[in-house]
């Protein structure tokens, strides 16, 4: 099975069903005749930008829209505790276990001023393309990550 077909099926499942984890997603793919290894699914989810977000009823795997929607932005905002910076980088503190999802969301914003992110358990390090852009990146994050 080609990667494109697998990606399309993953998107279809995540847009039409509530899926709480990758194991559940593997089972749903198997029901559709797609056998996939955990490592392959993990790579697919990363490539598709799948986020694991907290909802009122627990966790859910979600695919962000090409233009990040307000629903995902709202979920990300609930996970952020603080955004701080120094002369060279920006640090985002999140709820425990939520840094990866926040980092993925930032990566999918595809801001040319952001070189990349590194996520731990509850901290995201945002590395700007240039240290001269720290202020504008902070402003951008306030606008795109928080609903103030």
Swiss-Prot record:
This is Arginine repressor. One of its GO terms (biological process) is L-arginine biosynthetic process. SUPFAM superfamilies: C-terminal domain of arginine repressor, Winged helix' DNA-binding domain. Pfam families: Arg_repressor, Arg_repressor_C. Its main location: cytoplasm. HAMAP family: Arg_repressor. Regulates arginine biosynthesis genes. It comes from the Bacteria. One of its GO terms (molecular function) is DNA-binding transcription factor activity.
